[in-house]
Amino acid sequence: QEIRYTCDASGSVISYHVSLTTDLSAISDPPRDSCVWEELTVADAVYALAISSANDAANVLAEGVSGSIEAFAQRMNERAAELGALDTHFVNPNGLPNSEHYTTAYDMAQITAEALKNPDFLLYFGSGAYEMPATNISQARSLVCKNQFIDGERSCSGLLFSKTGWTTSAQ
């Protein structure tokens, strides 16, 4: 069975036997590559998240897993604590700024060490590009990472992956 998500102008739907509504007002960035009512597989959504920083995909996937962004953030906090990341508090799945959203380099190292135990993690986050297949409304398209360490423009010995991000408030 395939999990799919659908994004429209007023909300998003994830279906896996049932449909759940995602409140897009929780997204402070506009959707990156998804179109109104476009259906993507979970794998396509994760590639969009990892390569194109598709914050809309992060939120939709979170709702599909936990029912709401808040519930998913709570699960993230619980898992972080289990891993010993005690100076971390998440409020969203996409990392966009929030005064109650914080972590430390040590905690992120703990979380990353656990993520690296999953072989699919590097498949998604170590990819420099992905050919997204055609969807119900869009032709096939290329996602290309702008991270200079992933696309080969710069190098760092031993680097397995890296994730960049940018917001106005982070300047």
Which stretches of residues belong to each language-model region?
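Active-site SXXK
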Residues: 1-15, 20, 108
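Surface-exposed aromatic
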Residues: 26-32, 59-60, 88-97
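Penicillin-recognizing serine hydrolase domain
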Residues: 13, 67-171
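Alpha-helical scaffold elements that line and support the substrate/ligand-binding pocket
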Residues: 1, 45, 49-66, 72-76, ...
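Conserved catalytic neighborhood of penicillin-recognizing serine enzymes
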Residues: 13, 27-59, 140-161
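Acidic helix-start/capping segments at beta-turn-to-alpha-helix junctions
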Residues: 11-31, 98, 130-134
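A mature extracytoplasmic/lumenal domain signature
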Residues: 22-24, 36-38, 63-65, 94
